[in-house]
Amino acid sequence: MKGNLFIITAPSGAGKTSLVRALLDGDEHIKLSVSHTTRKPRPGEEDGVHYHFVEEARFVELLNHGDFLESAQVHGAYYGTSQSTVNSALAEGYDLILEIDWQGAQQVRSLYADAISIFILPPSMEALEQRLNNRAQDSAEVIARRLAAAREEMRHVTEFDYVTINDRFEHALEDLRAIIRSQRLRREKQLIRYQDVVQKLL
């Protein structure tokens, strides 16, 4: 693979989506893999930009055809990552971000051993609950379920290569940028990227 595959995971409300958007805004060499989902769009979300929004029957059809690199059911909705999209982006030399949960991360790591996994933690459960309430998108019952799911998800933090705490947005963003830069500078990636230059020097 010419590009790097980054897995970014976080509990709902930890700020993952905002951090990923900020990463994309400042880096033309990195792309976000747009997942398929059966959940309804949130305010401001666009089909094909934030997610490919599909009916459950269509999702199951794609799943049965083996189109998904990984898939999972989260908060009652299905999510899946297109394998062909991932492979083509990496082959073209782009770094690719997968915004997926810990279950999807396990599936991807079993297929892409050199994928780089990052877990974003909230500074506290109280801060996480406040962020979920501030979004004003879910009922108290749904928020309670999300908090319970967050505790379960965070138990898998030890399975990831890198961890950052999103206490201050800019600090967490700089952590992510540092991780991406360090991976781009790894010997095996540099020798592929600058193959012509290296051959002339040796």
Curated annotation (Swiss-Prot):
Keywords: ATP-binding, Cytoplasm, Kinase, Nucleotide-binding, Transferase. The keyword Phosphoprotein does not apply. Pfam families: Guanylate_kin. It is found in: Cytoplasm. Its main location: cytoplasm. CDD domains: GMPK. It catalyses: GMP + ATP = GDP + ADP. ATP binds at A10, P11, S12, G13, A14, G15, K16, T17. It is an enzyme of class 2 (transferase). GO terms for molecular function: ATP binding; guanylate kinase activity. It comes from the Bacteria. Essential for recycling GMP and indirectly, cGMP. Belongs to the guanylate kinase family. This is Guanylate kinase. The gene is gmk.
